[in-house]
Amino acid sequence: MKRKNFVAIWFCALLLAMSTLWISEAIAAQAEQPSGISMAVGRTKASTSFREVMINNPDIRILVEKSIKQASIINPDRKTNPVQSLDELYGFLDYTVTCMPWNIMPEEQYGSFSTKCDQSILYVYWLLDQPLEELKDKELFYPSVEYLEPIYTWLTEYNNTWRDFLDSEASWKQEYLDMLLRDPSWNLDKGWYESPDNWHSFNEFFSRKLSNGNSRPIAEPNDDRVVVSPADSLPQGVWNIDESGRFYADPIKREDGVIIKDSTFVSVEQLLGEPGAEYAKLFHNGILTHTYLNYDDYHRYHFPVSGVVEAVYKIPYANAVGGIVYWDKNKELYVLESNSLSWQSVETRGCVLIKTDYGMVAVIPVGMGQVSSVNFIETIKPGTKVKKGDELGYFLFGGSDCVMLFEGKSGFKLSVGKGEKGGYSAGYRHVFCREEYGRFLGK
């Protein structure tokens, strides 16, 4: 009898211990869920690999925790800053990699689709983009843990995990298409694009094709002096390249004028990478321009000039945000300052060099932020003759930028008219792909 009582007591104690452990784990899991975000997901590769980075690099873990703490001081509101501890970041990473781009952050906070995507994309970078005193002498693009290895490399793994979801059929439903059809910013009612029947994932929609050439008519198709825009985008301006191949990157400023990154010099050699080293000197004393694609733009890019392809290659890099993210307290929005130069040289990018009657031209599509995959049409190879307006490639989801380099003798001049300045606009109007972008005034 005593033995039976002992066994019963022991069994009850075991159940109590197991229940206590289960409750503790449930509480810990709940603590990892950012306020306002419901997550019923298990551990994913995104958070598992990040946790390993933290365990194996205790010094970096301290810096990450400091970055999160610094962010919580700048914006303590959990509605717009739900992650305020490292444990909460683990949960947030798991949550985001199976999310649609417009619902990572609480939807009621923002109005337009573009703003929802923008804030959702920028948020995780903002957490890791806080300037830290300990990193100021590390010669990073910006003294934040975003650019510190192994986090810099981990970001690509995180982004690829999300890309796998956006490539899958689970990322596309009729309700998503209906929602996008109702949003006028996408212009899906104008007959510009292929049939929606061709879209079986979000990325197939995002990299949608035109229905026909008339959707984006080519400006002056028989006049090779006219350079057309490579993409639907916002031109950011023109920069002169000096005799040593360097161009001056202006200081990066917030909208209130506060400088968040000092001016720097960047070289053509850095931008073209090692595969393009033999062509770099052609662009010394040349001209650079770049143009920004927003989320709701058509995300295929086309040749801006006619000629013969000399080289085509990719430069694999990490998926950094494409500038510097800061919190605008007045607007209650995360803002990406990407109008300036220099960040393109630390991003994944492609490059196509084209020999034209006006000298060599380099077209450099640049991925920005999450899942900005740079892809070329398979038929584009050295020796291929191309006409301006021909399709060159496409981006998958994320922000994107197109850089163009021209030789000095080309006399390239930007001809796009002025527009309202603010946000991602540098003061030029939005242009459509294959619309006139500039002209060659030299020979």
Identify what each model region corresponds to.
Residues M1-K2, A26:
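Universal eukaryotic N-terminal targeting presequences
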Residues K2-F11:
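Bacterial N-terminal signal peptides that target proteins for export
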Residues Q30-K443:
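Contiguous, well-folded functional domains in the mature portion of proteins
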Residues W22-A31:
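Signal peptide processing junction and immediate N-terminal pro/mature segment
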Residues W10-L21:
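Bacterial N-terminal signal peptides
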